[in-house]
Amino acid sequence: MPPERRYQIALCVLYTCFTLLRFRYRRAARAQIPVPREDNGDAQRLGVLIPYEVMTFFLYLLLPRTLAWAAVPVPAAVRWAGAALGCAALVLFAWVHRALGANYSWLLQLREGHTLVTSGPYRWVRHPMYTAFILLHMAAALLSANAFLGLTWLGGLALLLAGRVRREEAMLTEAFGTKYKAYMARTGRFLPGVGRAVNLAKARTHGSKKPSQG
């Protein structure tokens, strides 16, 4: 079997497992009380990003020569590290869904009786599901060793999350007030410990700007 075929199979297995996992929890979410669809542009952006990723994914699998011009030399160990990263992303997805329970929604909406989840991975990170998406996209970039696929997938995800995260945090701040602000102060947005480090840096900056007494 050609070495490239092994990477293609690994990527295919990862995204098949991801699709099955998401389908399971989305189906459960649809069975709950329906909510109005969001109207903030995310649906339109997803309507472009998802078909694009599916198209380039199958181009890489079935017609790899069409993307060969963007192939980059990546050591085998690094590419297989991408597979391990993808497995970690799948585990994180499952953990996130288990922590969210009935609070999960693929829409940027709060359901009736929505609670602030601070258990599981949410104990350290405010948006662990987005972290899992980032890890999965990084895994695809490493496994495919294709600059075009990796950069456009990660770039598209970054554009989507840039606005969505701000809106989500504003929505949760409005809903939970000081409780969510305190939660933000002790957690990172995508990585654990970053929030606290940022707050300490801000405190030191403000402290250094205080006028000296003489």
Enumerate the language-model features and the residues they cover:
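Histidine-centered phosphotransfer motif of kinases
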Residues: 119, 123-131
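Membrane-anchoring alpha-helices and their flanking helix-loop junctions
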Residues: 1-118, 136-214
